[in-house]
């Protein structure tokens, strides 16, 4: 199996777009980012479908060779400065003095500024497990705190 596959690597290398830039594209101010996002999402009915499909296929490629052994996939755990480097990301990320302890991990998922982005991650994981059939994918929640 796989002890830890980091979802943010799949997002960074394959998806390349901040999920909130697909949820709220009108907030992306950079023309270059808008153009690049339009190219990546061309052919999709909704820009968010690009995120879900690309992320699901990337995770499925990780899970396939190890099936039926467990593949632990950690939900995204970008720090704000890392998320800002994704296409369209600057519009959605605050400047933090110390991103290592800032808005990341589990606390990001339920916050109003990322809840819709987290829903896209969940849709991708559901597709991998229920539609593609890789039930060997096990979800890990990062950076839980009280």
Regions found by a protein language model. Give the residues of each.
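Conserved alpha/beta-domain cores
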Residues: 1-146
